[in-house]
Each structure stands twice: as C-alpha cells, then as structure tokens.
C-alpha cells in the first residue's frame, strides 16, 4: 500500500486513466462531440486538485504531464522536428488552458 501512495504522491499514477490500448474506446457512443478532448489528461479531476493542494509552495506541478510526455516523445521520434509534433503541442496547450480556466473559476478548491 505504501508503494501505491508514493506513486500517487509523485504524480505518476492516476487510477482513472486507462493505459491498456486494447481497452481504450477512442470513439465512445453517446458522447457530446463539443466536449471532446484531444489530450489524455483530465486537469480538473479531484486527484489533480488534491495533488496541487498538497505540493510544496516551491514545487512545480503539471496536471497535463501526460500530454507533455507525449510531446517530448514525438520530438524524440521525429528528430526534433517541431512541425511534425504540432498536434501534440496544441493538445498540451489546450490542456493547460482548461486547467488555468478551472483554477480561475474556482479558486477555493485549488488552494
């Protein structure tokens, strides 16, 4: 149990994220297409709010870290050609935008 708590504290594990590619439903039926996200992170989740509140003041926390990792992986695979990875950068930017808007709307839950 302590190992699981350390993983969650470090921000490397989200129990709601499906990591098995065979179980991911890329086009779920009945989902409103206006609310579709092009990034795997959920910056407004309760877990991210908790992690952000529990971090030290001098510590940096990025709720869009999965999108950031994907951007770096794309750069590595494409010989650091930024044009090839534009979609990944856009996805990260949208994730950060959603997170900052959520923090501005509800400052009490994002201490």
From Swiss-Prot:
Please give the start and end residues of each transmembrane region. Answer: none
Coiled-coil regions listed in the entry: none
Region called Disordered, residue ranges:
1-26
Q: Which Gene3D superfamilies match?
A: CytochromE C oxidase copper chaperone (1.10.287.1130)
Arranged from A to Z, the UniProt key words for this protein are: Disulfide bond, Mitochondrion, Transit peptide
GO annotation, biological process:
mitochondrial cytochrome c oxidase assembly
Q: Which residues form the CHCH domain?
A: 61-103
Bridged cysteine pairs (disulfide): 64-95, 74-85
Entries under InterPro entries matching the protein:
CHCH, COX23, Cys_alpha_HP_mot_SF
What is a single Pfam family found in this protein's UniProt entry?
CHCH
Q: What family name appears in the similarity comment?
A: Belongs to the COX23 family.
The record's function comment reads: Required for the assembly of cytochrome c oxidase.
Protein name per the record: Cytochrome c oxidase-assembly factor COX23, mitochondrial
Species the sequence originates in: Candida glabrata (strain ATCC 2001 / BCRC 20586 / JCM 3761 / NBRC 0622 / NRRL Y-65 / CBS 138) (Yeast)
Instruction: State the encoding gene.
Output: COX23
């Amino acid at each position: 149990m302590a190992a699981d708590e350390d993983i969650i504290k470090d921000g490397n594990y989200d129990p709601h994220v499906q990591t098995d590619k065979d179980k991911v439903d890329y086009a779920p039926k009945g989902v409103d297409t206006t609310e579709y996200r092009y990034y795997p992170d959920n910056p407004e989740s309760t877990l991210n709010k908790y992690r952000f509140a529990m971090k030290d003041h001098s510590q940096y926390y990025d709720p869009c870290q999965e999108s950031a990792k994907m951007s770096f992986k794309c750069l590595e695979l494409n010989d650091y050609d930024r044009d090839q990875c534009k979609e990944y950068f856009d996805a990260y930017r949208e994730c950060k935008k959603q997170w900052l808007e959520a923090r501005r709307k509800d400052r009490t839950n994002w201490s």
